[in-house]
């Protein structure tokens, strides 16, 4: 994140102060609630109507409980929100990426609530919180059930926790259904699985402690990550051709996020090293959408992932 020049910072600070005074005098006297965030407790009054999300998980949570955010960030490696949300997000304003938000675009939307990721810098938080209550997740990436905790956090901020609890209960029923299918379709000793994302430089292995891989574990797969991921990192460095054997599990879920990745994967699929993999010979490499499988999180993304797993199991030889 680039530093904000002092002149721009002061101009934004003045604008934000004026806006904060406006919102402070126009809020209705309604029930308030306090949520714990990365930067301390934040109090929210009423049911927000002008929500801006700066994190894909927050956008997913918003739609899962029926909220309609005005702004969102572009998905990783794309030019819009993730494909699985685009039908719901028609007309939404794009306010940057998860790495670099457009502060002026956010301010222009006059939000009454801003939802952000754990990675939001404190300087930006200070600016945004002058516009509207800003909820930055304090949940660590590798915490147990991190995505569920975040979903409940954002739903609480939206005043719709009861709807999120209902959505999670329905999802748990779906998880149980897919788990039963895994147990029916695959022998107990043939359930090892790995999630990789193919990049132009080669495949990266994703940690077994992330949103998607935790879902795979919940439905009965023995998820591995090849012991090639450094502590605190979500994925490995790109693997060389000589190390492709690390991908050779009973099931390989292979994600791509753009055309460059797809082209690189297509070239690799013709290589002897790739064709020697037993998982390839067994036809149990499952191509998946990297925007969902390696970037998204939340109830709606989980539904897409479970559908993909179900289709793969039913299509397996």
Predicted regions and their residues:
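Cleavable N-terminal signal peptides
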Residues: 16-17, 27, 244
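Proline-aspartate-enriched helix->loop->beta-strand connector
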Residues: 110-115, 133, 244, 248-252
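Extracytoplasmic substrate-binding proteins
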Residues: 41, 123-200, 284, 292-317
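Sec/Tat signal peptide C-region and signal peptidase I cleavage site
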Residues: 23-29
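A short, structured surface patch at a secondary-structure boundary
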Residues: 56-105
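Basic- and aromatic-lined ligand-binding clefts that recognize polyanionic substrates
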Residues: 50-54, 58-62, 164-225
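Bacterial N-terminal signal peptides that target proteins for export
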Residues: 2-14
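Structured C-terminal subdomain patch of bacterial secreted/periplasmic proteins
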Residues: 250-317
């Amino acid at each position: 994140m680039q530093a904000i020049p002092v002149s721009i910072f002061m101009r934004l600070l003045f604008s934000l102060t004026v806006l904060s005074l406006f919102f402070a005098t126009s809020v209705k006297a309604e029930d308030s609630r306090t949520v714990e965030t990365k930067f301390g407790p934040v109090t929210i009054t009423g049911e927000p109507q002008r929500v801006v999300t700066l994190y894909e998980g927050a956008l997913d949570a918003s739609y899962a409980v029926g909220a309609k955010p005005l702004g969102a960030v572009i998905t990783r490696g794309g030019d819009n929100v993730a494909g699985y949300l685009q039908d719901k997000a028609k007309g939404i304003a794009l306010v940057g990426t998860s790495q670099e938000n457009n502060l002026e675009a956010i301010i222009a939307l006059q939000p009454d609530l801003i939802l952000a990721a754990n990675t939001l810098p404190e300087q930006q938080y200070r600016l945004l919180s002058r516009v509207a209550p800003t909820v930055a997740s304090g949940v660590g990436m590798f915490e147990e059930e991190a995505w569920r905790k975040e979903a409940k956090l954002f739903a609480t901020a939206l005043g719709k926790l009861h709807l999120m609890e209902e959505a999670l209960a329905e999802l748990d029923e779906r998880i149980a259904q897919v788990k039963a299918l895994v147990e029916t379709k695959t022998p107990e000793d043939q359930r090892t699985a790995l999630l990789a994302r193919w990049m132009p430089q080669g495949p990266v292995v994703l940690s077994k402690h992330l949103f998607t891989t935790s879902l795979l574990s919940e439905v009965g797969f023995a998820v591995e990550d090849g012991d090639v991921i450094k502590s605190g990192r979500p994925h490995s460095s790109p693997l060389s051709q000589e190390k492709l054997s690390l991908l050779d599990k009973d099931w390989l879920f292979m994600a791509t996020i753009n055309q460059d990745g797809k082209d690189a994967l297509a070239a690799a699929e013709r290589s002897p090293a790739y064709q020697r993999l037993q998982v390839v010979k067994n036809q149990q490499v499952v191509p998946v959408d990297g925007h969902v499988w390696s970037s998204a999180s939340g109830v709606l993304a989980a539904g897409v992932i479970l559908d993909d797993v179900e289709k793969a199991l039913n299509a397996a030889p």
